[in-house]
């Protein structure tokens, strides 16, 4: 498990917001944690895959799309806050994200 520092958290949050602002052609100042990816931004699951690909390259993450898919089936990332929280977990747990919350 990787350590998720406050600096990395800020960096990841900025990446998520910048990504959705650019991809959805929305001013970043109009985005907030409650912004719905689908309803407010007309986003889709392919955007999340593209975002994960960016994070994989930036942080050398070892994660399979299947692992992300399994996690998202149980924990949908519907708002920007949930996308940010999911990307934090991806950074920390990589493929083990599917086991997060299990005992």
From Swiss-Prot:
Carrier domain ranges (all copies): 3-87
Which residue stretches, if any, does this entry annotate as coiled coil?
A: none
* Modified how: 4'-phosphopantetheine is transferred from CoA to a specific serine of the apo-ACP-like protein.
Task: Enumerate the UniProt keywords alphabetically.
Answer: Cytoplasm, Fatty acid biosynthesis, Fatty acid metabolism, Lipid biosynthesis, Lipid metabolism, Phosphopantetheine, Phosphoprotein
Which SUPFAM superfamilies would you find in this protein's record? ACP-like
Cross-referenced PROSITE patterns, in alphabetical order?
A: CARRIER (PS50075)
A Gene Ontology biological process noted in the UniProt record is: fatty acid biosynthetic process
Where is the protein found, in the record's own terms?
Answer: Cytoplasm
O-(pantetheine 4'-phosphoryl)serine-modified residues are 45
For this UniProt entry, what's an example GO CC term? cytoplasm
Task: Tell me yes or no: is Chloroplast among this UniProt entry's keywords.
Answer: no
Pfam family name, one? PP-binding
Keyword Ribonucleoprotein attributed: no
Q: Which InterPro entries match?
A: ACP-like_sf, PP-bd_ACP
Q: What is its main location?
A: cytoplasm
**Function in brief:** Acyl carrier protein.
Descriptive protein name: Acyl carrier protein homolog
């Amino acid at each position: 498990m990787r350590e998720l520092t406050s600096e990395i958290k800020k960096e990841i949050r900025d990446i998520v917001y910048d990504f959705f602002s650019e991809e959805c052609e929305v001013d970043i100042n109009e985005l907030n944690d409650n912004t719905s990816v689908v309803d407010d931004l007309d986003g889709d699951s392919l955007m999340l895959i593209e975002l994960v690909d960016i994070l994989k390259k930036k942080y050398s993450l070892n994660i399979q799309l299947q692992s992300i898919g399994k996690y998202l089936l149980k924990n949908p990332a519907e708002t920007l806050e949930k996308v940010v929280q999911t990307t934090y977990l991806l950074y920390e747990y990589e493929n083990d994200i599917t086991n997060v919350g299990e005992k």
